[in-house]
Regions:
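M14 metallocarboxypeptidase catalytic domain recognition
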Residues: 1-190
């Protein structure tokens, strides 16, 4: 009988290191079903984990029809990572002949492969899960990364409290001024 597999917590969002450790625990407990691979590196150098789920006794993953499932494409989409963990747990628990066995899951993993990438954007997720969270839509890589900075536009947390609360700070000597007919617009100071 295979070793007991881990049970993820569904009342929390995992930080990157904890998530990879959990995925490795599945691979260690069920090497006949779960293979943890590295899909690539993030902008900040974190591994992008890929979990390959299939019954290796019935063939290699390269030789079976497949389905791809991913989560956390955008920084704050943490629930998608949890959904991937839930599905991984159901697949592993449901395969075989144990108390939670499900014949449909067994047939699926005997004849198919499931590629699960629970967190495509580990850098953005880490920002969202930080002690002082920062919520961005995408990744920490600047976008567009080849664009020159705009004079007068400073995209940063000025006071270091982890929040950007004000878009405009008046500066009588700055490069920009309010438009005379539409004060909500800024125009270059001439």
């Amino acid at each position: 009988m295979p070793a007991a597999h881990p049970t993820p917590r569904f009342d929390t969002f995992y930080r990157h290191t904890e998530l990879v450790q959990l995925l490795q625990a599945y691979a260690d407990a069920r090497p006949d079903l779960v293979d943890l691979r590295v899909l690539g590196k993030s902008h900040e150098g974190r591994d992008i984990a890929l979990v390959v789920v299939t019954n290796t006794a019935t063939g290699d993953d390269d030789d079976k029809p497949a389905i791809w499932v991913d989560g956390n494409i955008h920084a704050g989409e943490l629930t998608a990572s949890t959904a991937c963990l839930y599905w991984l747990h159901q697949l592993v628990a449901g395969h075989g002949s144990g108390p939670d066995a499900n014949p449909q899951i067994t047939q699926l993993l005997d004849t198919r492969v499931v590629y699960l990438c629970p967190r495509l954007n580990p850098d953005g997720a880490e920002l969202a899960l930080a002690d002082k969270p920062r919520f961005i839509r995408s990744s920490t890589r600047p976008y567009p990364y080849d664009e020159q900075p705009v004079d007068g536009l400073t995209v940063e947390d000025i006071d270091g409290d982890g929040r950007v609360l004000q878009m405009r700070l008046p500066d009588p000597n700055g490069s920009w001024k309010s438009h005379p007919d539409a004060p909500h617009l800024l125009i270059p100071r001439g």
